[in-house]
């Protein structure tokens, strides 16, 4: 157990050191799009990892940037001592931010990577890109039916990034995945339980009996002790726009900035392309709660 934890920390520190070294060479104000694209194709691994992060951070959606990021998903040069692929991770994360659907096939392929965190980043980016063609492979990954994948290098050594996969399936409307997602409502890891509740709310029809139970379960989770989990639940409630959670969100022991983001998600769900005077009472209440947090 402790060996896996040490490996995970070592893997993370090795990646951070590469990015830090690159940042010391070229800061954000000096780096241009052309230079970042060139760096991503160069030989300096630190500069390559940093360039992939930079292109995503600044939403550089030039065709050339998309091309080199897709190519980076198959990189074999940048590997940590414990087998991770830092460049692939950053490339996968960046592609989700750039909104280019032609990255979808490469990201689906990345779900087969042995590196747990590449698979996690690929699932998150496929969710952001919103392409349903990724659903079958995501379901296979959720069922742990993709060969050659390795578990997370630190406790609890999850075999797959279940929360990222489940959230992607919920956002993509993968109703075929409901039976398997339901099983994760009782997972031993709380954040995976919450991801399952979020997805079940998204995938269940409003006319179904007990529809609100999944949103209510997330509201109840706002009262638990772990700040990191409360932050995750705030994100989940904002993502599904669960209006009954508004006051609980505002009262949660967490940063106001995160509560405002969550409430913004609720508000966006309520907004209709109508005149301001046609706003629902629920939307008005959310706006009042947001004002109080500012």
Swiss-Prot record:
Gene assigned in the entry: cpcE
Coiled coil: none
Entry EC no(s): 4.-.-.-
Name of protein: Phycocyanobilin lyase subunit alpha
InterPro entries found in the cross-reference section: ARM-like, ARM-type_fold, PBS_lyase_HEAT
Entry's Gene Ontology molecular function annotations: lyase activity; oxidoreductase activity
Class of enzymatic activity (EC top level): lyase
The UniProt record lists the keyword Lyase: yes
GO cellular component, one term: phycobilisome
Subunit comment: CpcE and CpcF associate to form a lyase.
A Pfam entry, by short name: HEAT_PBS
Species for this entry: Microchaete diplosiphon
Family: Belongs to the CpcE/RpcE/PecE family.
Entry keyword set: Antenna complex, Lyase, Phycobilisome
Function: Required for the chromophorylation of the CpcA gene product.
């Amino acid at each position: 157990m402790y060996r896996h934890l040490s490996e995970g920390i070592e893997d993370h520190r090795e990646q951070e050191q590469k990015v830090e070294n690159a940042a010391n060479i070229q800061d954000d104000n000096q780096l241009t799009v052309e230079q970042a694209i060139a760096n991503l194709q160069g030989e300096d691994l630190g500069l390559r990892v940093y360039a992939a992060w930079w292109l995503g951070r600044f939403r550089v959606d030039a065709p050339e940037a998309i091309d080199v990021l897709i190519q980076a998903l198959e990189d074999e040069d940048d590997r940590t001592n414990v087998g991770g692929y830092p460049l692939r991770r950053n490339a996968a994360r960046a592609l989700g931010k750039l909104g280019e659907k032609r990255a979808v096939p490469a990201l689906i392929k990345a779900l087969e990577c042995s590196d747990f965190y590449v698979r996690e980043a690929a699932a998150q980016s496929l969710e952001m890109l919103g392409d349903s063609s990724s659903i079958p492979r995501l379901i296979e990954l959720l069922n742990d039916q993709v060969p050659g994948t390795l578990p997370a290098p630190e406790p609890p050594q999850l075999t797959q990034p279940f929360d990222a996969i489940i959230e992607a399936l919920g956002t993509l409307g993968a109703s075929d995945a409901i039976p398997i997602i339901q099983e994760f409502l009782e997972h031993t890891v709380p954040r995976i339980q919450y991801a399952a509740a979020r997805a079940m709310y998204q995938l269940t029809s409003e006319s179904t009996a007990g529809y609100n139970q999944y949103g209510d379960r997330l509201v109840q989770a706002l009262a638990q002790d772990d700040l990191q989990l409360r932050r995750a639940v705030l994100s989940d409630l904002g993502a599904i726009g669960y209006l009954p959670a508004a006051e609980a969100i505002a009262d949660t022991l967490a940063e106001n900035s995160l509560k405002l983001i969550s409430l913004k998600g609720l508000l966006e769900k309520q907004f209709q392309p109508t005149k301001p005077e046609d706003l629902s009472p629920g939307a008005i209440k959310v706006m009042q709660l947001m004002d109080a947090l500012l």
